[in-house]
């Protein structure tokens, strides 16, 4: 009996070691990056310094070592063989193309925000995660970094905007179609139009919060019906974030931030801010498509 127990233990230990083994050389080959293994945590991490762009923060030139290095760390998964977490250092004109590459690869985007004040050019940080086969995860990371190289190769000079600026004319947005598509009753001001849709949350104090306390999705339109800007904010559950991001990016809407507005609320919400350009009808249907990915 003791012999049987010992053999069982050895087999179990062997299986655990096998499961925990991260193939660093394979990850290096698939990502094209050099990495290192933290043996105590069983994590293999690859890094990619942004030495291709000169960034100053508060007038001081930042070396990549001080926080301008993209990274991805691989560890054994629970439900699937491997998990990955990472942070990509991006310029403004790289963010949305890289986000699409990440989402198309099956990885998740979990945050998008700044780490500095007074940085020139402005730098954004996209946090990513995923679980699956190590090959798929590593290829997804590489696709994102290759997209950065592609953009900088085609346009070494950083873009100053999404495209041509909106014509400097008075706004004349017709809100009726927006209300009809979204099922809202919006507000007009100086030719602009805004709609707000609320959700419910219970705060840490037990207080109820809804639309007027900031638990809302909104969209504001300016320009003309034929050529408009839309900017706004989506409030989403954590389980809805990836579907909403994919829907907005599929329709050409730019994501400009993903973060929290609250702490301790139930259910837990994330907020994503967006910016789009096009005919009002097209933009409205893009927003409707993303809203359809959220709970009613």
Model-based region annotation:
Residues 5-15:
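Bacterial N-terminal signal peptides
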